[in-house]
Amino acid sequence: MSILDILILLAPIFFVIVLGWFAGHFGSYDAKSAKGVSTLVTKYALPAHFIAGILTTSRSEFLSQVPLMISLIIGIVGFYIIILLVCRFIFKYDLTNSSVFSLNSAQPTFAFMGIPVLGSLFGANEVAIPIAVTGIVVNAILDPLAIIIATVGESSKKNEESGDSFWKMTGKSILHGLCEPLAAAPLISMILVLVFNFTLPELGVKMLDQLGSTTSGVALFAVGVTVGIRKIKLSMPAIGIALLKVAVQPALMFLIALAIGLPADQTTKAILLVAFPGSAVAAMIATRFEKQEEETATAFVVSAILSLISLPIIIALTA
């Protein structure tokens, strides 16, 4: 695929993002209304797309995706753990700051850019399962783990943590992650396919597609709005998070894919899924803990801008 072909492929995607940026930057949306757009994508449109995609996939086809699932777990959760250890023991961050920094370096905005970018390359139906698996990894494993570690760091500083409260907090974090539509919808759908070999009737697919088909455009617009309403204040931690997200993590995923022996198309999917900009959700978790709020918000914007350069390069090298 030539550079011109790639730019033509990505042009509609970046056009909608830029349109969203104008809407956010010039006041058509504020933080509250932008959250409403994001909620439409993450709690309704994308879960509907996942259900329709997974429940029209055969059990054998689903099982063929297992190596890709393993790669995504290692490439996302494993990367988080590596950065966490580096921050904690080399840069001497406290545990909470280490967890926040690592989460923002590891969590991609797959929910907003996965369908438009990967769908343009492989077709929307072909990428439903990889994106759904990423949703489970992020919402049911990564976010709860990061929240638990950050909370332990806060509690240990205050010397208030007890065994009971730790396990209660752990259970609540995992349960919250599993209850998120981005995790619950694909997880339940996968169980229906793997255990019961269930296939959704055509009428059900059409009903879900009425909402799921809106995912691409609305999701990209939401990314642009989110970037547009944020202010940028460059710092070394912000630049570091952005570079880890769009350059280092995709490179690590390439090595993981080679080690596991993924075929070329799955390698491209795995690399692109982690190469997307940092996640606004991860930046919100930083705000929750009142740690590196400015840095993570800036990193989100910077990584989104850098992805305009990195994504075409990655597609040219792998697709």
UniProtKB/Swiss-Prot annotation:
GO terms for cellular component: plasma membrane. It is a multi-pass membrane protein. It is found in: Cell membrane. Coiled coil: none annotated. InterPro entries: Auxin_eff_plant, Mem_transp_PIN-like, Na+/solute_symporter_sf. One of its GO terms (biological process) is transmembrane transport. Belongs to the auxin efflux carrier (TC 2.A.69) family. The keyword Cell membrane applies. Its main location: membrane. This is Uncharacterized transporter YwkB. The keyword Transmembrane helix applies. Keywords: Cell membrane, Membrane, Transmembrane, Transmembrane helix, Transport. The chain crosses the membrane at residues 3-23, 36-56, 66-86, 108-128, 129-149, 181-201, 209-229, 238-258, 267-287, 299-319. It comes from Bacillus subtilis (strain 168). It comes from the Bacteria.
